[in-house]
């Protein structure tokens, strides 16, 4: 939210362009870090942060890294795959690029609740597997998925109905608004595939199994999406709609593979931390 607000301020109000977007990102990250540190240092519970007591616990660090690095790489893979799509979008001119930028800003806001539910699934599954309650862990994942579907459906209504107006917040040029509205209405109905991928990936991370979701995402968002873009642009149709559909195509492949893996995954033997 801070990033989006600062984007609007620096780009629309101050006319800073790309430089404004960069400053907005840096400031938003700094604000987030400071607020998080402040809350943790004032918290009275078991996760209170006391800087003078910071120590390395190597066994725990090894477990954190084994889960954290693949999870971080998943985020990097997503950003890296977006570069491929952006490269093809750039061929359609400045107006299309601006419309795509507006779409991605709105996209980040719409998928934020789903990403939060994914993180909640990670925590919920980890806690329940820690006490050996596999059934409750899986039940929580199902409810998180249904909730993500419901939230996405509610958010889709204003996105689909108000697509031109939402795009005009970022750029009021008619051609840009046309591209942005087209992309919003074309791609946003496919967010339900994104829900499946995010919730089940979060659940697998909570079970301490973050490598397979990383490999699935690498294959779907980088390998498959790049093959799709190359074949589509060079042999089928180098138009904005089929090129943009590389996004939901990647989501579909990723969600199908993640769901298939999750349904065949036995959680009974997963327990990241034996005793705390």
Where are these regions (language model features)?
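Alpha-helical transmembrane segments and their helix-entry boundary regions
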Residues: 21-22, 97, 210-214, 243-244
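Helix-terminus/linker motif at the lipid-water interface of multi-pass membrane proteins
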Residues: 9-16, 76-109, 127, 165-174, ...
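Short alpha-helical transmembrane segments in multi-pass integral membrane proteins
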Residues: 2, 13-69, 125-190, 232-276
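Functionally critical, cavity-lining and gating residues within the transmembrane helices
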Residues: 3, 20, 78-82, 93, ...
């Amino acid at each position: 939210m801070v990033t989006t607000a600062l984007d609007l301020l620096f780009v629309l109000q101050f006319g800073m362009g790309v430089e404004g977007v960069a400053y907005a990102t840096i400031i938003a990250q700094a604000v987030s870090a400071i607020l998080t540190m402040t809350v943790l240092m004032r918290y009275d519970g078991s996760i209170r942060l006391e800087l003078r007591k910071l120590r390395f616990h190597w066994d725990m660090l090894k477990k954190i890294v084994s889960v954290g690095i693949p999870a971080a790489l998943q985020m990097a893979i997503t950003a890296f795959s977006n570069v491929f799509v952006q490269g093809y979008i750039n061929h359609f001119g400045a107006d299309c690029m601006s419309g795509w930028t507006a779409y991605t800003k709105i996209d980040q806001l719409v998928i934020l609740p789903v990403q939060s539910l994914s993180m909640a699934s990670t925590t919920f599954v980890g806690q329940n597997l820690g006490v050996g309650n596999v059934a409750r862990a899986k039940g929580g994942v199902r409810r998180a998925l249904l909730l993500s579907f419901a939230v996405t459906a509610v958010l889709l209504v204003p996105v689909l109905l108000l697509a031109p107006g939402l795009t005009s917040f970022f750029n009021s040029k008619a051609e840009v608004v046309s591209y942005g509205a087209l992309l919003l209405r074309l791609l946003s109905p496919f967010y339900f595939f994104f829900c499946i991928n995010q919730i089940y990936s979060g659940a697998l991370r909570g079970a301490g199994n973050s490598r397979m979701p990383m490999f699935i995402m690498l294959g779907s968002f980088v390998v498959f999406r790049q093959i799709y873009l190359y074949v589509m642009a060079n042999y089928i149709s180098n138009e904005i709609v089929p090129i943009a559909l590389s996004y939901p195509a990647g989501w579909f492949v990723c969600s199908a593979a993640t769901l298939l893996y999750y349904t065949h995954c036995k959680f009974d033997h997963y327990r990241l931390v034996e005793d705390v």
